[in-house]
Amino acid sequence: MTSDLSSKHCESCEGIGAALNSEQIKNLLPQLNTKWEVTEDNRIIKRAFSFKNFYETMAFVNAIAWIANIENHHPDLEVGYNYCRVHFMTHALNGLTHNDFICAAKIDKLLVD
């Protein structure tokens, strides 16, 4: 997994135009950690993260919030005591854009597997 996506920044949704097609998604996915999955309808990328305790989970969630704020692109999160599930989709286009992959790559940089 080598990615320069993490060094890029998100574009305004108004300037993107259209969601990515399946070929574009297929080309971008290998640039992320292999634990990221694309839903069958190609509208969402998602990944589950596990932690030792609530404190580590919330520290991770806060780091995601910081990235989301800086990039002005926000994931859907499901958070529990020792887990966080992250889902990215560009809601304005009802599908995936480069923004989703950029933010996923930035999240990948937070943790060492």
UniProtKB/Swiss-Prot annotation:
Reaction(s) the record says it catalyses: (4aS,6R)-4a-hydroxy-L-erythro-5,6,7,8-tetrahydrobiopterin = (6R)-L-erythro-6,7-dihydrobiopterin + H2O
Lyase among keywords: yes
UniProt KW keywords: Lyase
EC nos: 4.2.1.96
GO biological process annotation, one example: tetrahydrobiopterin biosynthetic process
Family recorded in the similarity comment: Belongs to the pterin-4-alpha-carbinolamine dehydratase family.
Keyword Cytoplasm included in the entry's annotation: no
GO molecular-function terms, A-Z: 4-alpha-hydroxytetrahydrobiopterin dehydratase activity
Gene3D superfamilies per record: Transcriptional coactivator/pterin dehydratase (3.30.1360.20)
Protein name: Putative pterin-4-alpha-carbinolamine dehydratase
Signal peptide: none
Source species taxonomy: Bacteria, Pseudomonadati, Pseudomonadota, Gammaproteobacteria, Legionellales
First-level EC class: lyase
Entries under InterPro entries matching the protein: PCD_sf, Pterin_deHydtase
Pfam families: Pterin_4a
